[in-house]
């Protein structure tokens, strides 16, 4: 099998060399070219026809977001973004994922030559996944900012919780969540818990961005807080999200528990952990959604959801950036509905 062709785009000659050496060390990938800015990258893409691009965001001449937008308009080539861990960097990364980037890797800080090598395994794994995704990836957003929703009132702390939606996603998930969460109407009588595989810092930016676009209140989950209807709680990076029920008078209440117990399958947060916890602790109706992502996180916990008479939705392969997690879910034989991304919110509402 021929090696997958990779184009490296970064304005730092040092970074281009480091990334190139890492990629060329793998026998399934090869560097076919390097570019120092976005304009040069577009020219190299036309000339070299790479299978996948790894690209920095902050570059001269033509920045990464503008370059990515043009790539998506022309051929939807799979792109992996190198992102900084700064606040600006996390926000730019989320915009890149909305524009159509397949995934991202957080640029390490500190002693750069040693730290860059620490991401080698992650880089190679994600490049291989990206190189094998469809080139006809759907593009849902443009560089223009989406409409920001009006400020929401504070949630009613005494409102009874009778329904729960749990969502799991990985690669392609941030973009998919931007299509699902803002479509929920204000005042729904369910809370939504989300596990999206992302590093620390990125989940907070994701929650803030979704909150600005949604009628529901969206936030990064905090340890010990009460789970309320019409609110969305996103598991913070590097923490497992669990549910804990408590009896208050004659009524049950649900609370968030966060911990840094052992990663499951290398993942923290892990959907399996959240789903099993919810199935054990929640006393009423559960709807579970497994969306785009590599691997099989979530599938092992589906029998627990079914034991509680929960309903399960999997995203259809046609709209997945990576058909891994939904495929594993479908293969359990426990999924009730398989629907494209555009129909997930409507399907969830019909099951509540």
UniProtKB/Swiss-Prot annotation:
Family per record: Belongs to the CheB family.
Any one biological process term the GO annotation gives: chemotaxis
HAMAP family on file: CheB_chemtxs
Subcellular location, principal: cytoplasm
Pfam families: CheB_methylest (PF01339), Response_reg (PF00072)
Entries under SUPFAM superfamilies matching the protein: CheY-like, Methylesterase CheB, C-terminal domain
Residues of the Response regulatory domain: 5-122
InterPro entries per record: CheB-like, CheB_C, CheY-like_superfamily, Sig_transdc_resp-reg_Me-estase, Sig_transdc_resp-reg_receiver
Gene designation: cheB1
Enzyme Commission number(s) of this protein: 3.1.1.61, 3.5.1.44
Active site: 170, 197, 297
UniProt function note: Involved in chemotaxis. Part of a chemotaxis signal transduction system that modulates chemotaxis in response to various stimuli. Catalyzes the demethylation of specific methylglutamate residues introduced into the chemoreceptors (methyl-accepting chemotaxis proteins or MCP) by CheR. Also mediates the irreversible deamidation of specific glutamine residues to glutamic acid.
Post-translational modifications: Phosphorylated by CheA. Phosphorylation of the N-terminal regulatory domain activates the methylesterase activity.
Entry-annotated residues carrying 4-aspartylphosphate: 56
Domain CheB-type methylesterase: 155-352
Disulphide-bridged cysteine pairs: none
Protein name per the record: Protein-glutamate methylesterase/protein-glutamine glutaminase 1
Keyword Ubl conjugation applies: no
SMART domains registered for this protein in UniProt: REC
């Amino acid at each position: 099998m021929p090696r997958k062709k990779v184009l490296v785009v970064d304005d730092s000659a040092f970074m281009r060399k480091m990334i190139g050496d890492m990629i060329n060390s793998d026998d399934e990938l090869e560097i076919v070219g390097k570019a120092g800015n976005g304009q040069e990258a577009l020219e190299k893409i036309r000339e070299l026809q790479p299978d996948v691009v790894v690209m920095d965001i902050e570059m001269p001449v033509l920045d990464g977001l503008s370059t990515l937008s043009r790539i998506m308009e022309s051929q939807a080539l799979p792109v992996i973004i190198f992102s900084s861990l700064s606040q600006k960097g996390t926000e730019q990364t989320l915009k890149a994922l909305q524009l159509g980037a397949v995934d991202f890797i957080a640029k390490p800080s500190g002693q750069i030559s040693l730290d860059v090598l620490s991401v080698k395994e992650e880089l190679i794994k994600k490049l291989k996944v990206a190189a094998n995704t469809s080139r006809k990836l759907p593009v849902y957003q443009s560089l223009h900012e989406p409409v920001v929703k009006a400020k929401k009132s504070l949630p009613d702390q005494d409102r009874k919780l009778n329904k729960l939606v749990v969502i799991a996603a990985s690669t392609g998930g941030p973009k998919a969540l931007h299509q699902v969460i803002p479509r929920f109407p204000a005042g729904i009588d369910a809370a939504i818990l989300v596990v999206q595989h992302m590093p620390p810092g990125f989940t907070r930016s994701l929650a803030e961005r979704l909150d600005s676009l949604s009628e529901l209140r969206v936030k990064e989950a905090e340890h010990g807080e009460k789970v309320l209807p019409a609110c969305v709680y996103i598991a913070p990076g590097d923490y497992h999200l669990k549910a804990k029920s408590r009896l208050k008078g004659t009524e049950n209440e649900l609370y968030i528990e966060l911990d840094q117990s052992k990663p499951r399958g290398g993942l923290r947060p892990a959907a399996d952990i959240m789903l099993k916890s919810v199935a054990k602790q929640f006393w009423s109706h559960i709807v579970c959604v497994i969306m785009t992502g590599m691997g099989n996180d979530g599938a092992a916990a589906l029998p627990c959801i079914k034991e509680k008479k929960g309903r399960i939705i999997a995203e259809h392969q046609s709209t997945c950036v990576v058909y891994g997690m939904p495929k594993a879910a479908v293969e359990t034989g426990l999924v009730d509905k398989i629907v494209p991304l555009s129909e997930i919110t409507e399907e969830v509402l019909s099951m509540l």
